[in-house]
Amino acid sequence: MKQKTVLSIAGSDCSGGAGIQADLKTMVMNGVYGMSVITALTAQNTTGVRAIQEVTPDFLQQQLDAVFQDIDPLAVKIGMVPTGDLMHVIADRLRYYQAKNVVVDPVMVASAGSSLMKQNAVQTLVRELLPIATLVTPNIPEAQVLSGMTIANKEDMIGAAKKIGDSYHCAVLLKGGHSINDANDLLYANGELVWFAGKRIDNPNTHGTGCTLSSAIASNLAKGFTLAEAIQRAKAYISGALAAMLDLGQGSGPMMHNFDLQGEWTVSK
């Protein structure tokens, strides 16, 4: 059986709601074989991030080489990368291996508000990672940093998406879930704008939504769907995961990634 393969390059969330844990759950549910290269270990839960331990650039490169020299991923999702040195290694290795379908989720702040990227790393992000991206998926706060613009409405979203895409020559999916009154997302690709309508789901447990969306998009790109199709399918998946209303933890809890998993092996005694 020929299996589609996707690599997540991201941090580890010991509580399981975000990071590589969310990515791998999402990949399984979207029908691909998931692999992970860890950029950092985090001690976090639904209430916040307590500590971050970055890997060394050398160990990061060894992980990347180990994956690409054995199982070539058909898509790559990049999530939390806390330092510019680590971003440089990722960009270098992805160029070397001519990585395909690179989806960059520019994770800067955790759902609970903790910073996940060092401030001086943003310049490395825009200089080295965005130019090799097929798609970048910022939320409103991240798009404001990347574009240098204030985003208060849909017209601002259009302006910011165009500025990011034209500046770094990548497609942009600007997620409207932060501070805009609906869950509509905007794709800017090849000079064209496409809105993806989304019904806002009244669920306070949104830990890992960005990780999940970008991983689902990468999974669908690996399966051969167009960019627009991959986004639509990913949004449908994340809506189902949110609508399942999983309630875990004392803060902003995780989604139910396996909401549509059925089979005798899932039944509890």
Residue ranges and their predicted role:
Residues 9-15, 193-207:
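Short pre-catalytic strand/loop immediately N-terminal to key active-site residues, enriched for Gly-Thr
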Residues 16-32:
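N-terminal basic/disordered segments at the start of proteins
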Residues 21, 144-145, 203-227:
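Short, small-residue alpha-helix embedded
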Residues 119-193:
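Conserved phosphate/ATP/ADP-binding segment of small-molecule kinases
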